[in-house]
Amino acid sequence: MQDSHAWSGRFSEPVSELVKHYTASIGFDYRLAEVDIEGSLAHAAMLNRSGVLSDADLEAIRRGMADILDEIRAGKLEWSVDLEDVHMNIERRLTDRIGDAGKRLHTGRSRNDQVATDIRLWLRGEIDATVHLLAGLQSSLLELAERHADTVMPGFTHLQVAQPVTFGHHLLAYVEMLARDAERMLDCRKRVNRLPLGAAALAGTTYPIDRHYTAQLLGFDDVCHNSLDAVSDRDFAIEFTAAASLAMLHLSRLSEELILWMSPRVGFIDIADRFCTGSSIMPQKKNPDVPELVRGKSGRVVGHLIALITLMKAQPLAYNKDNQEDKEPLFDTVDTLQTTLRIYADMMRGVTVKPEAMRAAVLQGYATATDLADYLVKKGLPFRDSHEVVALAVRHAEGLGVDLADLPLAKLREFSALIEDDVFGVLTPEGSLAQRDHVGGTAPAQVRAQIARHRGRLG
C-alpha cells in the first residue's frame, strides 16, 4: 500500500504504526483548522497576485476551502492519523475535492512557517478574547466594590489584623492586578502579531512572494524579518503563558482569601450555592470548590510555562520536531484561564458580604493603633516615642479585653499627656478611614473615585 505521507518518496519503508501515532499531532492541532484555512487562503491570494497561481486555481482553492470549512464546522471532516497533522489533513481533503490546484497551494510554503503562522493567528484571537474576559471580571469586582465602598474590614499583614480598610478598597487591589494582566496580554499581542509565512522551511523561498501583502490580508502588523527566527522560536507563546500564569496567580490569591473569608471561623462572606459542593459523608458541609480548584489550576498553568521554557531552552536553529510539543500546553493554558475568568465573573456577583463580622474583626485587632501613633506625632511627639506609648496602651487594653476606643480618656492620658478628647475621632474604624483621603487611600471617597476611574478605563 502506498504511504500517505507527503514526504514518503525519500524512504524505503513505511513508518511504523507506533511511531506514526507517537509523532502525529492531529489529536490536538485540529483546533488550528480554521486559522489554517484562513492562512492558506491568504497565501493563495498572494501567489495569484505574484503570478505563481492562476485565477482558475485560486477560485478552485477558495471553493474547496469553503466546503472544507463547512465540513469542519458541521463535525463531518474525519481527521486521519496517517496524515499526521491538521495541515496535511486539510491539504489532502482539498486535493481530493479540486485535484491539482490543491497540490499547488503549498508552493513557496513549508509546514514550518505554516504552523508558526497558524499558532500566531489563533493566539491573537485568544488574546483578544482573554482581554475581554479580564474586563468582565473587573466589572464584576467593581460592582461589588461600589456596594461596599463604606464597608469596614480589617486589612492584614502576616495574616494579622493591621489597619482598617474598606472591603471595596480591598477588591480594587485585585482590579489593579487584573488591569495589569490585560496590559501584559495586549503588549504580548504586539509580538504575536507578526507574520512568519514566507520563511518557508528555514531559508525563505525562490518564488516571487509578497510577504507584506499576505500580512495585510491576515491583519498582521509586520512580517518576521529573519526566516530562521520566524520558523523556530516560540517565545511569543512563552510570553503569553507567562502573562496567563500571572493572571492565574492573582486569581489564586483571591481564591485563598475567599476560602478564608467563607470559613466559619472568619465568616466575612458567603459564596452562592451554585459555586459550592457538599460532602458525601458530612451533611453540614458547604465547600468552596471553585476557589479551591482555581488555586490548584494556577499550578497547572505555571507548569505549562515551565514546560514551554524547557522545550525551547536547548534547541539549535532552526525548526525541530520538539516544537510540536508547544501546542498542548498553550491550548490548555488558554482554556484554563478563560474558563476561570468566566466562572469568576459570575461567582463574584453572587458573593454575600457580612459587614457586621468584618467590623467586629477590626475592633478585635487594635486596628487603629497606628492612627493613635500618628495622632501623637501630629501633637509633636517623635514617631518612635509615639510607637512605644501606643504599644503600652495596646498591652493594657489587651489585658482588659477591650479596644483602644473603649479606654477612658483619663487612662489614655496616663500613657501620654498629649492625648485629648479629640482622640476618639481617630480611634474608630470610620475615623481611621476618613483620614486616608488621598489617591490610593482607603477613604470611601477615594474608593468611589477609583471605581469611577476604572470604569472610565474599561469603557
Swiss-Prot record:
What is stated as this protein's family in its record? Belongs to the lyase 1 family. Argininosuccinate lyase subfamily.
Any one GO molecular function term: argininosuccinate lyase activity
Reaction(s) this enzyme catalyzes, per UniProt: 2-(N(omega)-L-arginino)succinate = fumarate + L-arginine
- HAMAP family xref list: Arg_succ_lyase
EC numbers, comma separated: 4.3.2.1
Keyword Transmembrane helix listed? The answer is no
Tell me the organism's taxonomic lineage.
Bacteria, Pseudomonadati, Pseudomonadota, Betaproteobacteria, Neisseriales
* The protein's enzyme class: lyase
User: This protein is called what?
Assistant: Argininosuccinate lyase
Location(s), subcellular: Cytoplasm
Q: Which CDD domains match?
A: Argininosuccinate_lyase
Q: Which GO terms describe its biological process?
A: arginine biosynthetic process via ornithine; L-arginine biosynthetic process
Q: Does the keyword Ligase apply?
A: no
Supply the Pfam families for this chain: ASL_C2 (PF14698), Lyase_1 (PF00206)
Question: Organism, per UniProt?
Answer: Chromobacterium violaceum (strain ATCC 12472 / DSM 30191 / JCM 1249 / CCUG 213 / NBRC 12614 / NCIMB 9131 / NCTC 9757 / MK)
The pathway it acts in is:
Amino-acid biosynthesis; L-arginine biosynthesis; L-arginine from L-ornithine and carbamoyl phosphate: step 3/3
Q: Which InterPro entries match?
A: Arg_succ_lyase_C, Argininosuccinate_lyase, Fumarase/histidase_N, Fumarate_lyase_CS, Fumarate_lyase_fam, Fumarate_lyase_N, L-Aspartase-like
Q: Which GO terms describe its cellular component?
A: cytosol
Indicate where this protein is primarily found: cytoplasm
Recite the UniProt keywords alphabetically: Amino-acid biosynthesis, Arginine biosynthesis, Cytoplasm, Lyase
UniProt xrefs under Gene3D superfamilies: Fumarase/aspartase (C-terminal domain), Fumarase/aspartase (Central domain), Fumarase/aspartase (N-terminal domain)
